[in-house]
Amino acid sequence: MWEYAIFIIAYLLGAIPFAYWAGRYKGMDVRKHGSGNIGTTNAFRLLGAKLGVLVLLGDALKGALAAYLGYRFFGPWGGIIAGLLAMAGHSWNPFFGFKPSGKGVASGFGIILVLMPKITVMAIVLFVLVVFLTRYVSVGSVLAALTVGILVFLFNEPMAYKVFAVIAVSGVVIRHRTNIQRVLKGTENKFNLKR
């Protein structure tokens, strides 16, 4: 029975605010600067490459660990449920009043890296290419997420992964809707990496 505690652990893993901690290390509250998100992109923009990479790794790791634990004890459905809980913990952080706090992209990549590594590599390559060409992280994130959603069905992955793709991709697109509107208006901030 105790193994069901993994799902609580997954949610709490997702809530670990790496970007917030990194900002505090630099004497900054990232919630009050940039996009206000405690996520990877805001960390890169505000804190520079070194801390940004650490936040990226931390955010991806919490998704990966949650998915691994869920899969280890409950198979594909467990991996997906635990992964989605980690994304929820990141995106609506309980330590900050459940307000929208991140978009869950890095955590999502951690999840699919564990459960669908081949698809992850393809999505990451597309993400890097799109961001390099457009300088829009939001466009790269949305297109990479949509790619995951398509490839899960093309590769006929287990039903659990298809359900995850529909939910997670929808979540990523919805959380980026204001970014998409700004891209269309030409007012979205382009990604310029601080050193």
From Swiss-Prot:
Main location group: membrane
Entry's localization field: Cell membrane
Recorded GO MF terms: acyl-phosphate glycerol-3-phosphate acyltransferase activity
Reaction catalyzed: an acyl phosphate + sn-glycerol 3-phosphate = a 1-acyl-sn-glycero-3-phosphate + phosphate
Residue stretches spanning the membrane: 1-21, 51-71, 78-98, 111-131, 136-156, 159-176
Keyword Transferase: yes
Annotated pathway: Lipid metabolism; phospholipid metabolism
A GO term from the CC aspect: plasma membrane
Keywords carried by this UniProt record: Cell membrane, Lipid biosynthesis, Lipid metabolism, Membrane, Phospholipid biosynthesis, Phospholipid metabolism, Transferase, Transmembrane, Transmembrane helix
GO biological process, one term: phospholipid biosynthetic process
Known role: Catalyzes the transfer of an acyl group from acyl-phosphate (acyl-PO(4)) to glycerol-3-phosphate (G3P) to form lysophosphatidic acid (LPA). This enzyme utilizes acyl-phosphate as fatty acyl donor, but not acyl-CoA or acyl-ACP.
UniProt similarity note: Belongs to the PlsY family.
PANTHER family registered for this protein in UniProt: GLYCEROL-3-PHOSPHATE ACYLTRANSFERASE-RELATED, INNER MEMBRANE PROTEIN YGIH
Protein name stated in the entry: Glycerol-3-phosphate acyltransferase 2
Natural source organism: Desulfitobacterium hafniense (strain Y51)
